[in-house]
C-alpha cells in the first residue's frame, strides 16, 4: 500500500510546476500581469513593483507550487495579492465615498463562475487600463479585479480589503454598474454612484 501511495505522490508531484517553469511563465505573462496590477494600483511604476514583489513571493515561498494547468491563474492571483497589498492605503481612503450607499441589485451578487463575471474579466484584460483608472476609484477597481480575475466572493473581498460588508457591496455595485454601461454601450463614461446606488 505504501508503494502505491508513494507512486501516486510522485505522479502528482511530476504534474507540479518547477521554479524554472514559473520564472519562464512570469516573463510570458508579464504583459497580462502588469495590466492587472496597473488596474489596481493606478500607477505604472507601482504595477511593475507589484509584479516584482509577486515574483519574490514565489521565489521565497515554501508552499507547494501549482499544477501546470493552474499556473496562469495562480500567477494572476499572486500578482493581484501583491498589488492590493501595496494599495491598501489608497483603497481604504475611498471608503467614505460608499458610506451612505446601498446596492439593490441582486444580480450583482454573482459567484466567480457566472458568465457575466467572465465577460467582465475579459473586458478588464482587453480595455485600456487608463480608462478603468479614470472612471473607477481604487476600491471599485480592486473589487472588480478580485471578483472577476481572482474569483473572490464578497466575503473574500471583505477579508482581503479589511472593509465593511456595506462598503464592499456598494463598491461591487459601482464596478458592476460600470461594466453594464461598457457592455451595453449606453454611455461613454460610468455613472456616478448616486445615479445607480440608492441612499439608505
Question: What are these model-derived regions, one by one?
Answer:
Residues 134-156:
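Short amphipathic alpha helix immediately N-terminal
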Amino acid at each position: 500500500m505504501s508503494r502505491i501511495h508513494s507512486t501516486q505522490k510522485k505522479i502528482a508531484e511530476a504534474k507540479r510546476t518547477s521554479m524554472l517553469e514559473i520564472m519562464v511563465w512570469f516573463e510570458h505573462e508579464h504583459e497580462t500581469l502588469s495590466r492587472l496590477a496597473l488596474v489596481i494600483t493606478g500607477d505604472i511604476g507601482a504595477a511593475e513593483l507589484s509584479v516584482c514583489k509577486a515574483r519574490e513571493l514565489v521565489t521565497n515561498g515554501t508552499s507547494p507550487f501549482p499544477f501546470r494547468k493552474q499556473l496562469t491563474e495562480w500567477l494572476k492571483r499572486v500578482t493581484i495579492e501583491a498589488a492590493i497589498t501595496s494599495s491598501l492605503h489608497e483603497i481604504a481612503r475611498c471608503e467614505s465615498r460608499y458610506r451612505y450607499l446601498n446596492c439593490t441589485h441582486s444580480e450583482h451578487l454573482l459567484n466567480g463562475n457566472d458568465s457575466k463575471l467572465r465577460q467582465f474579466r475579459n473586458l478588464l484584460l482587453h480595455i485600456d487600463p487608463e480608462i478603468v483608472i479614470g472612471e473607477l476609484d481604487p476600491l471599485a477597481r480592486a473589487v472588480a479585479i478580485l471578483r472577476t480575475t481572482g474569483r473572490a466572493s464578497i466575503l473574500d473581498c471583505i477579508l482581503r480589503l479589511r472593509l465593511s460588508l456595506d462598503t464592499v457591496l456598494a463598491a461591487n455595485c459601482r464596478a458592476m454598474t460600470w461594466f453594464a454601461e461598457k457592455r451595453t454601450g449606453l454611455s461613454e463614461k460610468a455613472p456616478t454612484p448616486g445615479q445607480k446606488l440608492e441612499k439608505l
